[in-house]
């Protein structure tokens, strides 16, 4: 059985890595989601999530959104440039998105960073 997962090396894990992205980021915005990115020298893309309770109150909703973000990143990470990405939520309306709509919005964001 071939397991597909997001390896630990593909995630931003500490504060300094997040700060690095926020210092001089490229930004791409959709309705409610902002993607910050910055080139890295590792040769592969990495992802970090910053989803606050201010915009997504309930944990089960934050978890659903994070699950979809990680899954869309995992499926297209091999086509992305070597960058560090941080996704933030900037609208309370995102909790009303159906899963399909959320995935379409995320795929639009990743499309901007293809090779």
Swiss-Prot record:
GO molecular function annotations of the record: 3'-tRNA processing endoribonuclease activity; ribonuclease P activity; tRNA binding
Pfam families registered for this protein in UniProt: Ribonuclease_P (PF00825)
GO biological process: tRNA 5'-leader removal
Signal sequence residues: none
Organism: Blochmanniella pennsylvanica (strain BPEN)
EC number(s) per entry: 3.1.26.5
Recorded catalytic activity of this chain's protein: Endonucleolytic cleavage of RNA, removing 5'-extranucleotides from tRNA precursor
Protein role: RNaseP catalyzes the removal of the 5'-leader sequence from pre-tRNA to produce the mature 5'-terminus. It can also cleave other RNA substrates such as 4.5S RNA. The protein component plays an auxiliary but essential role in vivo by binding to the 5'-leader sequence and broadening the substrate specificity of the ribozyme.
Keyword Nuclease in record: yes
Alphabetic keyword roster: Endonuclease, Hydrolase, Nuclease, RNA-binding, tRNA processing
Lineage of the organism: Bacteria, Pseudomonadati, Pseudomonadota, Gammaproteobacteria, Enterobacterales
Bridged cysteine pairs (disulfide): none
Enzyme kind, highest EC tier: hydrolase
Protein name in UniProt: Ribonuclease P protein component
Membrane-spanning segments: none
Family: Belongs to the RnpA family.
């Amino acid at each position: 059985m071939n397991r597909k997962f997001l390896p630990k090396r593909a995630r931003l894990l500490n504060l300094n890595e997040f700060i690095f992205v926020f210092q001089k980021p490229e930004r791409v915005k959709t309705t409610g989601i902002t993607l910050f990115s910055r080139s890295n020298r590792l040769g592969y893309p990495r992802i970090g999530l910053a989803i606050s309770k201010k915009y997504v109150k309930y944990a089960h909703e934050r978890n659903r959104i994070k699950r979809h973000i990680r899954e869309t990143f995992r499926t297209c990470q091999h086509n992305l440039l070597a960058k560090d990405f941080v996704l933030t939520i900037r609208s309370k309306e995102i909790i009303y998105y159906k899963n399909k709509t959320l995935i379409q919005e995320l795929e639009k964001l990743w499309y901007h960073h293809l090779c």
